[in-house]
A protein has these predicted regions:
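Pro/Thr/Gly/Ala/Ser-biased low-complexity repeat segments characteristic
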Residues: 163-171
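Short aromatic-acidic-glycine turn motif
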Residues: 142-155
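Extended serine/threonine-enriched, polar tracts that run as long, contiguous segments within proteins
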Residues: 179-253
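Intrinsically disordered, low-complexity repeat and linker tracts
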Residues: 257-303
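Short, low-hydrophobicity acidic/polar segments
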Residues: 1-145, 171, 177-192, 227-229, ...
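Generic structural detector for well-ordered beta-strands
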Residues: 109-111, 122, 139, 186, ...
Length: 303
């Protein structure tokens, strides 16, 4: 089946009061016999404007396109609170093969697996001095925004994705510009969160920007980087930007994202590059950590 139409050409199962049941009673299905083996496939959630699925006997596919959910234009004010209009979807799938009526007393048990990668960013300074970095905005550039995931026999892997070839040089927002919401990072701080929230990406490898080439050349070559709009101050004097101006600093970025993993990148500030690839102070370094994806509310992610 596929997800065309409200019926989804499949069976819609929903949870009410802690119990899973048929959303539409007319969709109820019965076991043919007590010992007939059946294979079951599930996708959660069913579908939306950013992803779809198509299952046949020979192939089971889920197509997904990422959305720049933290961009300023995606937010609206509701009851005095800035809320997103659209958000990315944590798409999961589950497979239960060779099930009979006797396997689990007539119930089909699913263990869902994530098909996307989750990414968050933190920042800290490098030097043992009074350097202060004032961050106004952050974005990530040059990655594939979507593709098709083929459900594998084993565990999900990056190789199960066929990317759609649509690169994103204009970038996705990590931290949007908000008045009074700039982030100040000093050596005395532990690494500070600089993401507006966890980001979801199609699993893929990113090739970092090859400095000293320009940002324009990086976009042509589809090389990845972070753009950080910030000020850098030491001893009361501005090394980058000014009291009244934030400036753009660029950082080469590489990644190897796998499905179902959460990646935590800590930017260690000591400098970076301008748009022409010229160094500003010293290059920013990275510390990276990866965790199995933990089911935590997006508004309260313990990193």
């Amino acid at each position: 089946g596929n997800d065309s139409g409200l019926a989804n050409n499949g069976i819609n199962i929903s949870c009410k009061s802690g119990n899973w049941s048929y959303t539409n009673p007319s969709d109820i299905r019965y076991w043919p016999t007590t010992d007939t083996k059946l294979n079951f496939y599930a996708v959660n959630p069913g579908s939306n404007r950013f992803f779809s699925w198509k299952f046949s006997n020979s192939k089971k596919e889920i197509s997904y396109v990422c959305f720049n959910e933290y961009q300023t234009s995606n937010f609206t004010i509701e009851n005095g609170v800035n809320k997103p209009i659209h958000t990315n979807t944590d798409v999961m799938y589950a497979v239960a093969k060779d099930q009979t009526h006797e396997t689990n007393k007539g119930k089909v048990k699913f263990k869902f697996k994530h098909i996307l990668s989750q990414v968050v960013f933190k920042a800290k300074t490098q030097y043992d001095n009074d350097m202060e970095v004032d961050i106004n905005a952050v974005s990530i550039h040059n990655f594939q925004i979507g593709g098709t995931f083929t459900i594998p026999e084993g565990e999900p892997a990056q190789s199960n994705w066929t990317l759609n070839g649509k690169n994103q040089p204009s970038g996705f927002t990590v931290k949007k510009v908000e008045e009074g919401k700039n982030i100040k990072v000093t050596l005395s701080d532990n690494a500070k969160d600089i993401s507006d929230g966890p980001m979801l990406f199609v699993p893929q490898k990113l090739t970092k920007w090859a400095v000293p080439s320009t940002i324009a050349a990086a976009n042509t070559a589809k090389q990845s980087y972070l753009k950080i709009t910030c000020k850098i101050k030491q001893g009361g004097a501005f090394l980058f930007g000014s009291n009244t101006e934030y400036k753009d600093l660029y950082v080469p970025f590489e990644a190897d994202w796998q499905p179902g993993k959460r990646y935590i990148y800590t930017l260690i500030f000591g400098g970076g590059y301008d748009a022409d690839g010229n160094p500003i102070l010293q290059p920013i370094n990275f510390e990276a950590a990866v965790d199995d994806w933990k089911e935590e509310p997006e508004s309260n992610v313990d990193l």
